[in-house]
Swiss-Prot record:
Expressed in roots and flowers. Residues 1-20 are cytoplasmic. It is found in: Golgi apparatus, Golgi stack membrane. One of its GO terms (molecular function) is galactoside 2-alpha-L-fucosyltransferase activity. It comes from Arabidopsis thaliana (Mouse-ear cress). GO terms for biological process: cell wall biogenesis; cell wall organization; protein glycosylation. Its EC number is 2.4.1.-. This is Fucosyltransferase 6.
Amino acid sequence: MYHIFQISSEVFRAFGLKMKILLTLVFSGLLIWSVVLVSFSNDFNNQLLVATSNVSRESETPRDRLIGGLLTADFDEGSCLSRYQQSLLYRKASPYKPSEYLVSKLRSYEKLHKRCGPGTDAYKKATEILGHDDENYASKSVGECRYIVWVAVYGLGNRILTLASVFLYALLTERVVLVDQSKDISDLFCEPFPGTSWLLPLEFPLMKQIDGYNKGYSRCYGTMLNNQAINSTLIPPHLYLHILHDSRDNDKMFFCQKDQSLVDKVPWLIVKANVYFVPSLWLNPTFQTELMKLFPQKEAVFHHLARYLFHPTNQVWGLITRSYNAYLSRADETLGIQIRVFSDRAGYFQHVMDQVVACTRRENLLPEPAAQEEPKVNISRSQKLKAVLVTSLYPEYSETLKNMYWERPSSTGEIIEVYQPSGERVQQTDKKLHDQKALAEMYLLSLTDKIVTSARSTFGYVAHSLGGLKPWLLYQPTGPTAPDPPCIQSTSMDPCHLTPPSHGCEPEWGTNSGKVVPFVRHCEDRGNDGLKLFDEL
């Protein structure tokens, strides 16, 4: 019996040793597998976070997530992915660097907004004065908190351009900018200022009235000037600024130096605008001195302001990154083409298509289709791929271009891929998904290497200026034939102020506002109308 137990004991010891080895192997395997899983999970999360894993880059230099100091690092990245990721999608770093003075001014503004923004005692006190509309504020101190309210009107391109303009004015005059949230602004953009909100509270005392403000409103600045109802001894608690395409000469006096000394004393400004009015601010000598320090590269004003202010929400950023990765990231070269038809009977027009083709071929942006098929079929994988992103309400333009390079090869041997994200035929401003798609397409256009845009199009202005691109501008057709020449390349990327003051601020009303200062001149796509900032003299 003893021998049996002795044998059993040895068997168990041997079995126990094998079990230890087996368990060690199992646990080692599990440990290695868990490390692999964690690594895979982290990698997956990182890819999900950036959503740009296959973005092609020309260099391996680290991306500048704060864009030269434009952005502060005080935000949680996950709440707004685009804020710190936008620089990753651009193939080249922007040659336009923000000045140290601009960066310093933005940090100071953020502190001001935090002290005076919604929810603060200062904001509560400032709104109380709006209940006393008959009072004169000429001799009263309103403290450091003065405000300018941006009201959303017209299409998305107009809104982005005007909001940037209003913010710059706030920066110059040390006002706090508040944004009308009755439309879909919060579905499109993240909050731009840390620790506070730029959204105008819905209980704002004038909220129910501001939609009805127009040139006839008694507190409209142009109307008050006309009626001689405002001067240094008669200052109302709020003013309405009408900076629209139908502004009168008196409305446009707002840009003048002596008028600003009056406007500066008003605690609240309410603005409706549908034009990019930044160039006209440079006509004011006081503003001009400050603007020169803020923007040594004058044509980069909107470029910097847009990259600071406008960060698409995560939902919109998903539209952008998925489209970019699927259609643009693998291309050797990308071209954006934005087509806007200004016509009572909009749609697909052959002369517009002819104009686009003529422009892209003449400027060597796209190759001509080959006259005939090559005798040998090129199946090389090293052929150059050029991706063409087309944005238009009408899909027929991209379909025509796509068929052109499907039916015949390109004369250069390049592979031409044409892609249009959407073609909704009708502009549907204030419909959430429509506006989100429109914003995504503006950003996608800004990511291309070269860009062709339609004259007068605010959609196009936003896209090329955001991307730091000097566009080829398609002249607006004046009849049923394509213009000749079809387009012109701009020497400045800044947008155009489409209906600016026609005169300077001096008494001689005949002054040409395009000749007041050498770097504010008429836009290439507007003849003797419109003002634009140029660096090239």
